[in-house]
Amino acid sequence: MRFAPYLISAVVITTIILGGAWWTSAMDTKLQTKMKEIIDQHTSTWTPVVSSVTSTQTDTLRVTISEVVSVTATLTETFTATPTVTSVVHALATTDPHPDNSKIVILMGSNFQNDANSPLHPFAQSIIKNRREYAERHGYKFEFLDADAYASRVTGHLMPWVKVPMLQDTMKKYPDAEWIWWLDHDALVMNKDLNVVDHVLKHDRLNTILTREAEYKSGAGIPADGFRTPKDQDAKDVHFIISQDFNGINAGSLFIRNSEVGRWIVDLWFEPLYLDHIQGYAEQQAFSHMVFYHPQVYKHVGVVPLKAINAYDFDDNIWGYDDGDLCIHFAGCNYFKNCPEKFLKYAQILSSKQGSDWMSAQEKDHIQNLLKPSS
């Protein structure tokens, strides 16, 4: 009987593992069912598949179809699947190879302007002004949404989720917009002369910066190494632009095309099953899950270098900010409790180029006092 405790422990661990696998598989089955419902709501985006596809399921959760790379697991089951839909390029009328500036919307959402305990509260109006004036300079539209007004839509969930219904509402509010650029509140536009159409969005430019066949960083939402971005992706097929860091996909800065494909992706992203079951990295983890498990999402997501749209305050030539980069994102500053320090570092850089005009009138004196060298 001396082995009884070990046997009991082994049984308990095995039960937990099998139970977790069952729960995860059941969740993914529900997500697949819900995804089909959402697809059916956007019927003009999809066309029927006429032939069956024989595929090997090498992961208990993921059906490997088309160009998606399969991964090897212990148990392998071969089956024949006839998908009901496959994605096609959206109408050319909404995939302009060189969108007009007037059809770009910069979206920002936060409650830091209301919350005196927010570490960036003393600088909130200047950050908003920085974003708005950049939009006005290039003829983009600017939309700021109060996160407190969206709290009821993510009750019981982490606040970063509010960006998804904000995207949904903005896409509806600006039906003629071509692209929505979401940039987190803990960021500053650093190069006011850089036009995001020329820098990222026009097809010939996007085709030069897409990271094709690059490995997605494994982690939250992407459980396996060796999963890569599409090999032959073309800008005309991209409806979602994002970047990744050492933790994987980072949703602090992203571009979403206001097309049926784009709206479908956002609708799936806000599926209640994701909100209820995904914690940790919240909306980032959910989006990673979508990319990894759903080929229809995978093929329309373009990954670009972090520095192109989402530079960090790192001493690193891959992720770190360099003079001339579009923006700086203080990623993780809440966790490291250094948001004010990050802001002031880049406020100093902006002031050396633009003086104090970028600051809000009510915050200018406070910021300038903080920027004075200590005696």
UniProtKB/Swiss-Prot annotation:
Residues 24-375 are lumenal. Gene3D superfamilies: Spore Coat Polysaccharide Biosynthesis Protein SpsA, Chain A. It comes from the Eukaryota. Residues 1-2 are cytoplasmic. One of its GO terms (cellular component) is mannan polymerase II complex. Involved in the O- and N-linked oligosaccharide modification of proteins transported through the Golgi stack. This occurs in cis Golgi where the enzyme transfers galactose from UDP-galactose to a variety of mannose based acceptors. This is Alpha-1,2-galactosyltransferase. The lineage of its organism: Eukaryota, Fungi, Dikarya, Ascomycota, Taphrinomycotina.
